Amino acid sequence: MDSILRLTSILTWLLSGLWHVGLTATNYNCDDPLASFLSPVAYSSSSDITGSTSSAQLNWRMGTGGWSPADSSAHQWLQLDLGNRVEITAVATQGRYGSADWVTSYHLMFSDTGHNWQQYKQENSIWTFAGNLNADSVVHHKLLHSVRARFIRFVPMEWNRNGNIGMRVEVYGCSYKSDVADFDGQSSLLYRFSQKTMSTLKDVISLKFKSMQGDGVLFHGEGQRGDHITLELQNGRLVLYLNLDDKKAWLSSITPSAILGSLLDDQHWHSVFLERVGKQVNFTVDRNTQHFWTKGETEVLDIDYELSFGGIPVPSKPGTFVKKNFHGCIENLYYNGVNIIDLAKRRKHQIYSGNVTFSCSEPQIVPITFVNSRSSYLFLPGTPQIDGLSVSFQFRTWNEDGLLLSTELSEGSGTLLLILESGTLRLLIKKVTGHGTESLTGRSLNDGRWHSVSINVRRNRVTLTVDNDAVSLAPETSGLQIYSGNSYYFGGCPDNLTVSQCLNPIKAFQGCMRLIFIDNQPKDLISVQQGSLGNFSDLHIDLCSIKDRCLPNYCEHGGHCTQTWTSFYCNCSDTGYTGATCHNSIYEQSCEIYRHRGNKAGFFYVDSDGSGPLGPLQVYCNVTEDKIWMTVQHTITELTQVQGSNSEKPYAMTLNYGGSMEQLEALIDGSEHCEQEVTYRCRRAHLFNTQDEAPFTWWIGRSNERHPYWGGYVPGVQQCGCGLEESCQEIASNTGFLSSKDHLPVTQIIITNSNRTNSEAAWRIGPLRCYGDRHFWNAVSFSTEASYLHFSAFHVEFSADISFFFKTTALSGIFLENLGIKGFLRLEMSSPSEVIFAIDVGNSPIELLVQSPYPLNDNQWHYIQAERNIKETLLQVDNLPKNKREVSDQSNFLLQLSSQLFIGGTSSRQKGFLGCIRSLHLNGQKIDLEERAKITPGVRPGCPGHCSSYGRNCHNGGKCVEKHNGYSCDCTNSPFEGPFCQKEMSALFYSGTSVTYMFQEPYPVAKNTSLSSSAIYKDTAPSKEIVTLSFITAQAPALLLYLKFSPQSFLAILLSRNGSLQIHYQLSKVESHVFTVGSENLANRRVHEVNMNRNGQELSIQVDQQLFSYNFSPEVEFQTVRSLILGKVTETLVLNPEVTQANTLGFVGCLSSVQYNHIAPLKAALRHASIAPVTVQGTLTESSCGSMVESYANGVTTVYSSSDPFGNTDEHEPLTNAIQSDSAFIGGVIAIVTFIAFGVIGIMTHFLYQHKQSHHTNPMKEKEYPENLDSSFRNDIDLQNTVSDCKREYFI
């Protein structure tokens, strides 16, 4: 059996090869002149200056010397009857001899019958041929696609402005032989096999067909085991069903293998080519090809008994068919090299035919096309004053709206209108009195298919029939008296008519009509064309020029295509792409770019190839670290145990990352580093066989290859990383990282040694993690105008998008250029403020200009995005408005570039670009500029100076640091951290929390601070002081910040009893300055920002949005800072009563973004406590002040006191979020401390009162104290008395 299959496949291959050779031979040297020997009667035209068509052969000089119409206007044509169907490969034209008459451009049309013409198209557009520039020269055109027809028409489009239309023509080609079969819709051909079953590994089926209807079976075959192959027309499209040895199913329930073509019921020839090799199938209709893999269990197609063509007959029931039969003609039908129609014509025994004839009978149907939605119409006369009315026709269109018919009825009956509205037919009869009646029927009638419409009015009964579905008007029409009028306007109304003669409440119809009957009489539309019947405007007669603009579908990435008569539109919803053709991704290409655009950490979609074919993939971007990690999670994240596996029954688990391998590979290739953590734990289930070193366990990587090495070790070595480093803590456990990008990601793990007694294994594969974008900072520098980089030609064709960054100081320069045989593409900076995108697809160049209001040669990075698709061309610079231009419908949109792509210059080495270009993308493809620059003179890899453009991204005092592949933000001198110094450093303080920063030589983290910041380390007092902080609290009084100058002098920022902000400057034992800033209670559970700036004797204080200013007197002298304290001051110092009271309770709340000049003490305590001169006492918890605001917002607002700083009066309702447990503890501590404090204060008050009384009764020259009074308490008393006597208080 195998030998028979092999022999059958060889014969099929040979026969199909011979068939292709035969076709090639037919086209070989097919360039004979076909018009030279035609008789004059073979020429016809729309009109002629002599009254009868003159001979118009090439080089003809007799008579009028060629053809000229009686009137040089649109819709003139010259027609040739070539006698039989021939193959036309070229044409040539001249002007009329001895005259100023010639045609400068023209269209070609062809037909088999002299009716139902077809326009010559190239690249899916009506092709315009360039004509002559004088009367004598010959212009020759080789057709890109040969044409098979009997009749050919030359349709002048433009001609000599100083003359008229004049043509002499020649047609080149050769004879065309074919075998044709005509199917009447009730017959079929059967090809019986010599054996019961035909088994094939390869099939080749080819044919051409011309259909009279939109549905019908072209061929069908099936086998008893479920194999089947069926090709049929459905709604004007070809549907292929193909299945190999699968379970048998009814055809109605089978999903089509492929659907191709559209509008295939246009009565024109269409070619089909189907090739199958095993499960791989190539399916071509006309010039559209679809490649796919068929379903089934084998690669052999088994067909039993026969193949049927034209229908599917029911066995044992002659004349009965399963589905609708094909009605039309089939030509040159080949099945695996066998000419089926030739066998039928010769009545070979393999062929059984029904009522099939072998010539193509075609009805003489004349279609018309309404071209213009404003001015197209057709006027046809009718027979007036008939009691009743009858009109019928067929139409097809893509437009939802349009006027189909308008006629003024006789005897004052009113006006009858038939309108297409939102794809539904609306019949409206308007009476002269204003009353009327209407009916709606049909839906989606703008689907491009032919639809039949009939209006019949008889004996006051109005019936509207659409596609055999009849509907009658409402009962009130029984009183209507309707009499036919004498004029019928189809499609629209002329401008010169009165309203009553033709009504058009909607735009004119754009589409095709045919088979028009009025009063049951067919209308001769050729007579309309010749001017002997009716009238028309903007019509194509004897031609239906409908075009399916959604085939092929130019909406990319799964966009849904919809269309009108003149254009198509792409619905990009839920695709992840945008633009006129869904070409541009709405997602960024890496986490690096998301970070660069200011996004925070979270889940994002990353589209690694931008506008390329790969879709977006969801990842997690951790943008809070210096290295931006991109994480792709898979479906199995937990430690998984395995038991009972062996070499015969291995354990295998596949990991699903939620995307294709191509998406993952693109993500990995575009990253600088990738890794996956792997963990393997085992008991009596080894990784490797110690005898022959064969692996017991391995994993599968990206290339579907086995890898026996494990975490931390180099690829190709069967060992674990901890074994290499001799750092294994457990013999039965290994954890490490896989970091070979060529092998990642891990797609499968195999374990074969966990079936021994008491043996088990456990594994865990971590997510795929990558950092770095290899292309975002990929840059080159061009140093001379003659330097450039060159790459292979830019393959664009239908869509082209270009994007890159540039910076320069030059006045002009070309960014890139690519030339073709006819067209080109160029992007350049034409002046310091102008960028031009020029493109030519072969007809005429288009230039888009963007003018910038600012100079582009400022040595800053600027972004350019240019795009050209079949709908529009656009250019954008930075965030300036886009310059966009729609592409003309008739234009040639296929851009073919043949030369090399030049970056930074041109092949002429002139007008080159001086500066830097980076992150160049062409149609989503990332161009590695740096690698090419390494071997190119005059071009250097990399480009310094990123901080000049992106330094503004370093916030809150962060310093921009240059890197080869970008920049980073140094947050050393900032109270913030993170990639852009935007993450606030904040912490929760409790009543006993104290953070002390000692000023001395800078700690190692701050070694690179500027010279201006070094003043705070000297013994001299700083001339400037800047203090910034944010806080949230519900406690008052509260000490926020304390700066110690000496034991007796300090600066304190606190909240007073009423919650207002106070600044205390204690500059000596006797000199104090107190500033009360506003009266607002800031202990209100909200975040407040304080910014204090002292410059010399000037002091400014900003609280939130309010700014206050003050000037110190000139004699005030400031001192050197020794330490800075946040929270409670724990050491024994001389404090005034307000500071003492605020310090007694400490600070309970959240402090963030604390900075004194260039020192960030809170950040030092949280991040560098081991190396910075900072000491932390009590509990300091890193937190977020923002989360506390949310906690407060979710809680109950109550009145609070100093004993309850967070304001919880309801002891049964804890604080929400992260501070619930902490707040309970804090509240208890505060209550105890407050009780003790008030007790101490009470005792002190009592003692001082007694002491004061004795002091007044016994005056002393010097202060005297009891001998048993503690010395520290004496200092407190001194401080209080001094402050009471010398304090200066300011209210601002």
Curated annotation (Swiss-Prot):
Q: Which residues form the F5/8 type C domain?
A: 25-174
List membrane-spanning regions: 1224-1244
Q: How does it sit in the membrane?
A: Single-pass type I membrane protein
**Which regions face the Cytoplasmic side of the membrane?**
1245-1292
List, for all copies, the residue spans of the domain called Laminin G-like: 180-360, 367-544, 778-943, 987-1185
Recorded family membership: Belongs to the neurexin family.
Q: This chain belongs to which protein, by name?
A: Contactin-associated protein like 5-2
Organism expressing this protein natively: Rattus norvegicus (Rat)
Q: What is the lineage of its organism?
A: Eukaryota, Metazoa, Chordata, Craniata, Vertebrata
Gene that encodes it: Cntnap5b
